[in-house]
Amino acid sequence: MRFCFFFFCFTASIFCTTGNSSDIVFCCAHTPCLLHLEVDQETSVTWIDSNTGQIPLCLSNGTCHISEKGLHFSANFSKDGLYIAIINETNYHAAEHYYLVYIYENCHQMPYDSPRHTGHKGTSFNWSMGLWLVKCSHNKTFFLPFVLDSAKSAPIIMTETAITIYISMIFLIVSLLTFLNVLITLNNKYKHYGV
C-alpha cells in the first residue's frame, strides 16, 4: 500500500512535467475568468486555441476578449481547453501555454478571514485542501490536492513546476512517516525478543 502511494506520487510528478509546460488555470463555472498575461505595449501577442490551431472561436462570438491583462472569458463561457499565447517582440519570441479548467461544484467564495497568499503572477487566493482532477497539457490527467480561489472572478494559476514541488513535499512527508513507522516496528520487534 505504501509502495503504491510512493509510486503514484513519483509517477504523477514525472507525468505532468513532461512535454510542453503549461499553466493550469482553475475557474468557477458561470463566472468571468482570466488567462493572465501582461506584456509591454510594444509586444505583439496572438492567442490560439490549440484544438483548432486558429484564434479562439469565443473572440468571434463575443464570449471572450483580449486586453492588456490577457484573455478574458465572460460568465457565459465554461469550456475547458488549452490556449496558447504567442509572444513576439524585438529579439524575443515565446509561447505561453494555459490549460483552462472549469469547476462546477464546490467552487464558492471562501471566508474573508481565511489566510491569503500570493499566487503565480500576482494572483491572490485562499488555500482549500481537497482532491481534484488536474489536467496537464495534451489531455494528461491525474488527481492531486488543489487550491480554490477566494474570488470567483480571479482564477488560480499553478505552474507544473509548482505542482511538482507540491507533490514532492507530500512524498517527503509520507516517506518520513513511513520511516518512523519502520523504526517503531523494529523497536517493538526487538522488545518482543528481549534484545
From Swiss-Prot:
Glycans are attached at residues 20, 61, 76, 88, 126, 139. Keywords: Early protein, Glycoprotein. This is Early E3 22.2 kDa glycoprotein. It comes from Canine adenovirus serotype 1 (strain Glaxo). The lineage of its organism: Viruses, Varidnaviria, Bamfordvirae, Preplasmiviricota, Tectiliviricetes.
